[in-house]
């Protein structure tokens, strides 16, 4: 962690920096001292202490009251700038891509939408979900870091401006994409095998997914769970890992299981129909579902590691800062302080793993666009759309005829 080397330079430049600066207790830059006896209450307000995690000599006891900066010291500022830039730029692209697919597959252009066409509605719902992720990213782009860091050393909480809204939008979009990915895999199997689904059954599935998504997105507000996490996310999201497991990761695990079954059944159906001239057109959606499966799998592995090792990562950072200051005070011959030897710098979260996580979440909206925009199905939807037929450029039955022939 290169950040810690900058701490060393600060210490050296100030000859070990005293804990008293102009009569005020000071912490090493970029940390900030906060006098408190209620660290738990402060956490609820958004303050994150470095938490040395072990008894300290009196001369160093002030370090337990040092606040972590927002955004956190797990990454250098250049790294955070890269993360923020990725979310802003890629989020805007994903928002636009999702909106285009929503328009084509939604009721504005899709004549089959209100006929409860299973496939087009499923694609629309997935695009709608990634659209909400894009909206949350645009909120971050508009408000910048102030949305997650209302103060230099305080992380946003649900009571802060825009954080609750951003958290709900992100959760709603991300969770929705997960559940509709699962159904997209089942839809692929139905299309590849030629099986049909009762429209009433599909209506029940449609309503159930959206109702469940709404409940799981708004319920965390009852526990004041939305806020800025000091690692993993750039947006506001669910703070406590047990709440994350209950309201997101459990649903993702179930969706991955369904997705895996759907992928296997689709492959099996395609193998059985290798002589069918329509087999190739089912391969592209299968590739999309497989890529989504891999991305969601990476997300759960990454966040699982983060959640399980969060306290460990904090302790590494805290111990390294404590070691540096201990040695600095020892060199100043402060009574009672013993030189602790060379301070080691252990890796916590790599830049590439964090970047990949943020990238994969934003890639969802771009993928649905890339895989469906130029498909034959999309071209038929455009040809049969209200707008195309209004100007005499299309055939209102084009998509339905294709559907009858192949589905």
Swiss-Prot record:
Predominant location of this chain? membrane
Q: Which stretch is the leader sequence?
A: 1-23
Membrane-spanning segments: 90-110, 121-141, 170-190, 200-220, 247-267, 286-306, 355-375
Q: Which residues are glycosylated?
A: 37, 346
Gene Ontology, cellular component aspect: membrane
- Localization: Membrane
UniProt superkingdom: Eukaryota
Keywords linked to the UniProt accession: Coiled coil, Glycoprotein, Membrane, Receptor, Signal, Transmembrane, Transmembrane helix
What spans does the record annotate as topological domain Extracellular, numbered to this chain?
24-89, 142-169, 221-246, 307-354
Q: Which residues lie on this side of the membrane: Cytoplasmic?
A: 111-120, 191-199, 268-285, 376-407
Task: Name it.
Answer: Frizzled/smoothened-like sans CRD protein J
The major lineage groups are:
Eukaryota, Amoebozoa, Evosea, Eumycetozoa, Dictyostelia
């Amino acid at each position: 962690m290169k950040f810690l080397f900058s701490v060393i330079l600060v210490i050296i430049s100030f000859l070990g920096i005293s804990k008293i600066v102009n009569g005020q207790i000071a912490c090493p830059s970029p940390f900030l001292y906060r006098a408190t006896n209620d660290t738990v209450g402060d956490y609820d307000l958004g303050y994150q202490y470095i938490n040395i995690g072990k008894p300290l000599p009196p001369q160093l006891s002030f370090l337990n009251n040092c606040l972590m900066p927002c955004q956190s010291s797990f990454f250098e500022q250049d790294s955070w700038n890269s993360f923020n830039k990725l979310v802003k730029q890629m989020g805007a692209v994903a928002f636009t891509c999702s909106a285009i697919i929503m328009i084509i597959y939604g009721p504005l252009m899709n004549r089959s939408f209100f006929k409860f066409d299973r496939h087009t509605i499923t694609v629309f719902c997935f695009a709608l979900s990634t659209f909400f992720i894009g909206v949350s990213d645009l909120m971050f782009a508009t408000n910048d870091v102030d949305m997650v860091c209302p103060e230099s050393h305080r992380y946003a909480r649900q009571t802060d401006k825009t954080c609750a809204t951003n958290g709900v939008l992100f959760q709603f979009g991300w969770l929705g994409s997960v559940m509709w990915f699962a159904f997209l895999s089942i839809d692929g199997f139905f299309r590849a095998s030629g099986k049909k689904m009762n429209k009433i059954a599909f209506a029940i599935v449609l309503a159930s997914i959206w109702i469940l998504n709404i409940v799981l997105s708004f319920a965390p507000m009852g526990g004041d769970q939305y806020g800025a996490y000091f690692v993993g996310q750039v947006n506001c999201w669910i703070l406590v890992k047990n709440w994350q497991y209950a309201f997101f990761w459990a649903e993702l695990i179930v969706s991955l299981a369904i997705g895996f079954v759907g992928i296997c059944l689709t492959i099996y159906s395609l193998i059985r129909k290798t002589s069918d001239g329509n087999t190739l057109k089912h391969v592209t959606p299968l590739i999309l579902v497989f890529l989504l499966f891999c991305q969601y799998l990476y997300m759960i592995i990454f966040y699982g590691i983060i959640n399980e090792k969060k306290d460990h990562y904090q302790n590494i950072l805290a111990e390294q800062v404590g070691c540096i200051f201990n040695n600095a005070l020892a060199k100043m011959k402060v009574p009672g302080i013993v030189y602790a030897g060379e301070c080691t710098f252990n890796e916590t979260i790599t830049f590439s793993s964090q970047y990949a996580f943020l990238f994969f979440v934003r890639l969802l909206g771009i993928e649905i666009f890339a895989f469906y925009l130029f498909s034959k199905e999309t071209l038929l939807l455009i040809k049969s759309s209200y707008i195309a037929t209004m100007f005499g450029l299309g055939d209102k039955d084009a998509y339905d005829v294709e559907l009858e022939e192949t589905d």
